[in-house]
Curated annotation (Swiss-Prot):
<dbReference type="GO" id="GO:0006412">
    <property type="term" value="P:translation"/>
</dbReference>
<comment type="function">
    <text>Interacts with and stabilizes bases of the 16S rRNA that are involved in tRNA selection in the A site and with the mRNA backbone. Located at the interface of the 30S and 50S subunits, it traverses the body of the 30S subunit contacting proteins on the other side and probably holding the rRNA structure together. The combined cluster of proteins S8, S12 and S17 appears to hold together the shoulder and platform of the 30S subunit.</text>
</comment>
<dbReference type="InterPro" id="IPR012340">
    <property type="entry name" value="NA-bd_OB-fold"/>
</dbReference>
<keyword id="KW-0687">Ribonucleoprotein</keyword>
<dbReference type="GO" id="GO:0003735">
    <property type="term" value="F:structural constituent of ribosome"/>
</dbReference>
<feature type="region of interest" description="Disordered">
    <location>
        <begin position="119"/>
        <end position="140"/>
    </location>
</feature>
<keyword id="KW-0694">RNA-binding</keyword>
<keyword id="KW-0488">Methylation</keyword>
<feature type="compositionally biased region" description="Basic residues">
    <location>
        <begin position="124"/>
        <end position="140"/>
    </location>
</feature>
<keyword id="KW-0699">rRNA-binding</keyword>
<dbReference type="InterPro" id="IPR006032">
    <property type="entry name" value="Ribosomal_uS12"/>
</dbReference>
<comment type="similarity">
    <text>Belongs to the universal ribosomal protein uS12 family.</text>
</comment>
<dbReference type="GO" id="GO:0000049">
    <property type="term" value="F:tRNA binding"/>
</dbReference>
<dbReference type="GO" id="GO:0019843">
    <property type="term" value="F:rRNA binding"/>
</dbReference>
<keyword id="KW-0820">tRNA-binding</keyword>
<protein>
    <recommendedName>
        <fullName>Small ribosomal subunit protein uS12</fullName>
    </recommendedName>
</protein>
<keyword id="KW-0689">Ribosomal protein</keyword>
Length: 140
């Protein structure tokens, strides 16, 4: 515990807030081959592998995860939300930040319904989160 005199001489240092999605904070200048500080809400990338991962205790499932190499050169693991997907190696995807609580090391989500990722079909509720189109009205 510092004395008042020590605090007067040298004040406390504020804690630096760490980003939850650090790969979205970096850009890449391909002309100069340099990493830049260009923050973005989403980033495009190419799938290097698509696999299933088992979650931490106490949950049990086979969660769908893709390894994605982003346009800034960083490779990350991203979760594929929804039931069923059409992703495979070399698919071009858009990722956003947001971790999956029971999958260690997965800090990003893949956006459904954009680029090579198809939306979830037969989805009626929360359609915008899964890239599903509005269903056609049935004839009366």
């Amino acid at each position: 515990m510092p004395t008042i005199n020590q605090l007067v001489r040298k004040s406390r240092k504020a804690l630096e807030k760490k980003s939850t999605a650090p790969a979205l904070q970096k850009g890449y200048n391909s002309l100069n081959k340099k990493v830049t500080d260009a923050s973005a809400p989403q980033k495009r990338g190419v799938c290097t592998s698509v696999k299933t991962v088992t979650p931490r205790k106490p949950n049990s499932a086979l969660r769908k995860v893709a390894r994605v190499r982003l346009t800034n050169g960083i490779e990350v693991s991203a979760y594929i939300p929804g039931e069923g997907h059409n992703l495979q190696e070399h698919s071009v995807v858009l990722i956003r930040g947001g971790r999956v609580k029971d999958l260690p090391g997965v800090r990003y989500h893949i956006l459904r319904g954009t680029l090579d990722t198809a939306g979830v079909d037969k989805r009626r509720q929360s359609r915008s989160k899964y890239g599903a189109k509005r269903p056609k009205e049935a004839k009366k």
